[in-house]
Amino acid sequence: MNLIEKICSNPSEYTLNVERLGECKIDSPIRNRDFIDDDERILVTENVKSLQLATERLGMTPSFERAGPHHKIFHDPAWSRVGIVTAGGLCPGLNHVIKGLVEILVCDYGIRTIYGIRYGYAGLIPRFGYEPFMLDTDTVDTVHENGGTMLGSSRGQQDTGEIVDTLARMNINLLFCIGGDGSL
């Protein structure tokens, strides 16, 4: 069963919109970039027959919100603290993603507090004793030359309440989760 068939057979299981924390009121600090409008969407599939079927059954064309920089943002970069975690199975390019993310956060958004969370979500559970470490453009400068993930990874479910408590204690208001199927 393809994704369109799954969506049509049980639409309540699939959320194609991203929930918002609140209204985005802060001007983006990014300059010289094309911005994404809030109403831009990407089709779930390019197959016209599947799209027609889904549109008839659902009364809408299945699509995702388009990712990318927006004119207005929610979190003020001057006060933002970021955590980056890699979880699930290893997949190619994790260190490239970490490097690119840190560079954009620092150079484009001006964020200065970025924590690398060790060993997946287990790194957010205090009893495991994995201390986070600071990431900056120097610490990720050559990381893309190595395989795997500089942060380490782990599999297995962790207690969501404990994770949220740790994020609150560390004042992390942005958490980037990178990885394979197990990262969600």
Regions found by a protein language model. Give the residues of each.
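Mid-domain, small-residue-enriched loop/turn segments at the edges of structured enzyme/sensor domains
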Residues: 184
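Glycine-rich oxoanion-binding loops at beta->alpha junctions
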Residues: 35-75, 122-175
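Short glycine-rich or small-residue beta-strand-to-loop segments that form or flank ligand, phosphate
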Residues: 81-91, 149-152, 173-179
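Helix-enriched interaction subdomains in cytosolic or periplasmic regions
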Residues: 2-60
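An acidic- and aromatic-residue-enriched active-site/binding cleft used to recognize and process polar
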Residues: 119, 180-181
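N-terminal phosphate-binding or glycine-rich loops at protein starts, especially the Walker A/P-loop
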Residues: 1-24, 75-125
